[in-house]
Amino acid sequence: MVTVSTVTPQTSDKALFQRRDAHLTLETDLEGSELFEVSLGELTPTRPTDEAADLTVGTAGTSIAGMLCEGRFALYLAGEPYKSGLKAQGCGKLKKAVFSIELDEDEEAE
């Protein structure tokens, strides 16, 4: 599934990490740029997991940070806490495409 949206970036301290356990997430900016953060540590949930959306949000320590812009993409692995849509200096709204790629449960069992 792909979702295209216009996003107003927020500062890192206002954003929570998110984690999807049954999906890979691939993001690319169509217009504008943003910062992102990834945690290699444990996610501490701030509310119950939304099983239907395969989404857990919470806090974690930042291990890696980077910048996403037109022509580049970021791939977040299943189970990997990340923040995206973070404000980059001098950048306003951005248009982005988010691809949600469902994992094959049978493949994981093997």
Can you name each region flagged by the protein language model?
Residues 12, 21-23, 61, 69, ...:
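Short beta-strand-initiation
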Residues 42-44, 82, 91:
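Short, surface-exposed beta-strand-loop junctions and turns on beta-sheet-rich folds
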Residues 2-22, 29-45, 78:
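Conserved short histidine dyad/triad with adjacent acidic residue
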Residues 59, 67-86:
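Conserved metal-binding segment of the jelly-roll/cupin
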